[in-house]
């Protein structure tokens, strides 16, 4: 492996900018002048065991606005991993900060407590908004983390960290600058040259911030990876948890759909929602899933993903929702909803009642999460009484991992509901909920 900084950031690069960054007037500074090129640039490498099987932690959008939100991250996510994870390294999938680039370093110090090498991806909230071209927009990021795109191997897997933040003049009439998803020809050439050295039967994992399906020049990347039998891409950005399978409907020409994961975010819904007993907002995402991170496991060319909810038992993998009390005449008309956080179209989800009935398949639906809607409405009423007590939750979004099934007709009494699920990786989980039925 390469050397690590005191914050466990891999030191695999040398920055040569004799006059420093072109960042005159930037709010956040870039690279200081490096002076003349040294006589040699040396990269020590240290031997380490890299077995066929290994794991990595994935953080989407920690996105702290200030030190208080860095503390939220520390208490809600980091502390549970310190001394307890068997991951070989971790990756933050962009939006390391929320425009305030002074939070980079305190967040680095927090994540460093996990005790493993930590790679970083550039996000749209990690750039210098003062820049007037893409090349200079990454100067502060580059000073702390190094290049915005690069590659590395761990064990049998090849990783490509990509920069898909295209900083551009959005409106020439007003002079307004903004971003869109884009790799650019220079980076696509780098990817082409990099992959030319990677055997066809090696798993390639591409990590970026904006989801691949939203990147303007994604078809150029498709052409570079679609003939490879083993590839995976991972992003964040949307503050949801999603699995996408890219096909010819989006211009993919490979023999099999390409799996793209949109990872859960550490900050959830930007630290919105009422605080818990620790003073930390619940931060439920707009798809009804909690904030948290993921653990990805590799075994040669195979991989699997595990959702790690923040501040909860790691075995909590779903929410089951229905009213607390129903009349007997209502039961057969009442749906049970199961929000399976890491679920996809390839998951099986089934339900049974009172541990004696048969398991019945639940229907995968594209709806908003009803518990998110109720929570949002309730909190909005409280905020009307006490404005500014916490940040208002976002609008609900369509959940891609929601299932439902109506209850059968039930007699009065307390009834136990079980939901079981098996995901595309063969991982099984069980959820429980009870309902009280009263006579009409």
Predicted regions and their residues:
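Extended active-site neighborhood of metal-dependent phosphoesterases/phosphodiesterases
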Residues: 12-33, 101-200, 218-234, 238-299, ...
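Aromatic sugar-binding surface patches on proteins
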Residues: 116, 368-406
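Active-site glycine-centered loops adjacent to acidic/histidine catalytic or metal-binding residues
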Residues: 61, 94-95, 123-124, 209, ...
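N-terminal active-site segment of His-dependent metallophosphoesterases
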Residues: 19-104, 193, 439
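Surface-exposed, short loops/turns at beta-strand junctions within beta-sandwich domains
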Residues: 35, 407-413
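Short acidic, glycine-rich surface-loop motifs adjacent to enzyme active sites
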Residues: 194-214
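Binuclear metal-dependent phosphoesterase catalytic core
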Residues: 254-343, 347-350, 402, 406-407, ...
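Short beta-strand elements
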Residues: 10-20, 24-25, 424-440
């Amino acid at each position: 492996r390469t050397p690590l900084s005191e914050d466990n950031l891999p030191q695999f690069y040398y920055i040569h900018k004799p006059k420093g960054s072109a960042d005159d007037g930037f709010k956040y500074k870039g690279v200081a002048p490096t002076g003349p090129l040294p006589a040699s640039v040396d990269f020590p490498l240290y031997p380490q065991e890299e077995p066929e099987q290994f794991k990595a932690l994935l953080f989407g959008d920690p996105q702290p606005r200030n030190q208080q939100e860095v503390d939220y991250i520390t208490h809600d996510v980091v502390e549970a991993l310190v001394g307890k994870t068997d991951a070989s390294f971790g990756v933050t999938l962009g939006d390391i900060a929320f425009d305030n680039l002074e939070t980079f370093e305190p967040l680095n110090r927090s994540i460093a407590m996990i005790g493993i090498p930590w790679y970083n991806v550039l996000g749209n909230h990690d750039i210098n908004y003062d820049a007037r071209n893409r090349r200079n927009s990454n100067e502060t990021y580059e000073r702390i983390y190094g290049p915005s795109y690069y590659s590395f191997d761990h064990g049998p897997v090849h990783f490509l960290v990509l920069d898909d933040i295209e900083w551009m003049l959005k409106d020439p009439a007003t002079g307004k600058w903004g971003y869109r998803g884009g790799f650019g020809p220079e980076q696509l050439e780098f990817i082409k040259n990099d992959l030319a050295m990677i055997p066809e039967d090696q798993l390639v994992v591409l990590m970026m911030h904006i989801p691949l399906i939203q990147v303007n020049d994604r078809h150029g990347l498709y052409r570079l990876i679609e003939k490879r039998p083993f590839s995976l891409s991972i992003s964040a950005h949307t503050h949801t948890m999603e699995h996408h399978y890219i096909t010819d409907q989006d211009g993919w020409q490979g023999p099999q759909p390409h799996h793209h994961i949109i990872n859960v975010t550490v900050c959830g819904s930007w630290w919105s929602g009422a605080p818990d007993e620790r003073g930390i907002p619940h931060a439920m995402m707009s798809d009804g899933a909690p904030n948290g991170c993921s653990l990805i496991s590799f075994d040669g060319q195979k991989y699997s993903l595990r959702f790690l909810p923040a501040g909860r038992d790691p075995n909590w993998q779903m929410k089951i929702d229905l009213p607390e009390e129903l009349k007997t005449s209502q039961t057969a008309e009442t749906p049970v909803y199961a929000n399976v956080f890491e679920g996809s179209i390839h998951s099986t989800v089934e339900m049974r009642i009172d541990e004696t009935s048969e398991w019945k398949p639940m229907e995968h639906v594209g709806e908003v999460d009803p518990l998110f809607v109720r929570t949002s409405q309730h909190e909005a009423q409280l905020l009307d009484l006490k404005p500014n007590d916490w940040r208002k939750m976002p609008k609900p979004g369509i959940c891609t991992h929601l299932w439902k099934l109506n209850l059968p007709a039930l007699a009065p009494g307390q009834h136990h509901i079980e939901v079981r699920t098996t995901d595309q990786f063969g991982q099984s989980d069980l959820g429980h909920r009870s309902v009280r039925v009263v006579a009409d």
